[in-house]
Design a protein with these regions (language model features):
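Juxtamembrane/disordered regions of integral membrane proteins
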Residues: 2-259
Length: 259
């Protein structure tokens, strides 16, 4: 059998496996976004009010009131976090899924740590004065950093459950998996292009790199593909961690200067 013929035979199977992984990753990330990102963030703000009752009712930078959990605000935050997480968390989940060792809990902790490094500054923002205004910076940072860990644990648990319950990619339902793979990868590629238009080279590397290593790992599984994925995950985590540490130091030192 020629190389071209073998590639034609293997491509549909690879696409089915990629589609199954994309479906699991997106669903797990959406569930984690709803619970950890949406509901969890509202609980975190309530805990800020518990730590410092004097800030209850004050407006945050996002025009939410500390300690108040309105139905409309909670639903809006839950829906937003769910949709955003389907992409942000989903691509990193799939890119790292075959690399993280250990049990479901350990994998969840590692995924949460990676997401904290990569996307931590999207939440723990040094320019957001709320971290200095409410309670204490250490308490606030700890609460919102914990949301990433909770996200990783929920995503890992949901993903593991789906891995057990969904039919394999080689079963009769392989075609829907293939179609799901085409649709999700196409959607993620469009979103990655939109992110690229924003001009942030780090986010470009995160999203486009995740799509690239995930596709390579399924289409051409090999030690080289795993090596690329490991290098990608280590690289974006290291770069993101540097920015996160800088943000935390800036917030804490700014609080010390204002004291």
């Amino acid at each position: 059998m020629t190389v071209a013929a073998r590639a034609r035979r293997e491509s549909p199977a690879a696409l089915r496996h990629l589609g199954r992984s994309a479906l699991i990753g997106s669903t797990a990330a959406m569930a984690a976004g709803l619970l950890a990102g949406g509901i969890g963030s509202r609980i975190a703000m309530s805990l800020v009010a518990v730590a410092d009752p004097s800030v209850t009712g004050l407006l945050t930078a996002n025009d939410n009131r500390v300690g108040e959990m309105s139905l409309g605000g909670t639903l809006f935050l839950a829906v937003t976090a769910t949709l955003v997480s389907a992409f942000h968390g989903g691509v990193v989940y799939i890119a790292s899924g075959r690399l993280l060792p250990g049990s479901t809990v350990v994998r969840g902790l590692l995924l949460g740590a990676a997401l904290l490094c990569v996307f931590g500054t999207e939440i723990i923002d040094a320019t957001n004065r709320d971290f200095v205004r409410f309670a204490s910076p250490a308490w606030d940072i700890g609460l919102f950093a914990g949301l990433f860990v909770a996200f990783g644990l929920v995503a890992s648990g949901v993903g593991a459950a789906m891995e057990r319950r969904l039919p394999s990619a080689d079963a009769e339902l392989g075609l829907p998996f293939a179609l799901a793979g085409v649709g999700l990868i196409a959607l993620w590629s469009v979103i990655a292009v939109l992110v690229s238009a924003d001009g942030d080279p780090y986010l470009i590397a995160v999203f486009e790199g995740a799509i690239g290593v995930s596709t390579l790992a399924h289409v051409r599984p090999s030690h080289l593909a795993s090596g690329f994925a490991c290098a990608y995950l280590a690289g974006i985590s290291a770069v993101g961690a540097i920015g996160l540490v800088r943000a935390v130091v800036d917030i804490v030192t700014r609080d010390a200067r204002l004291s």
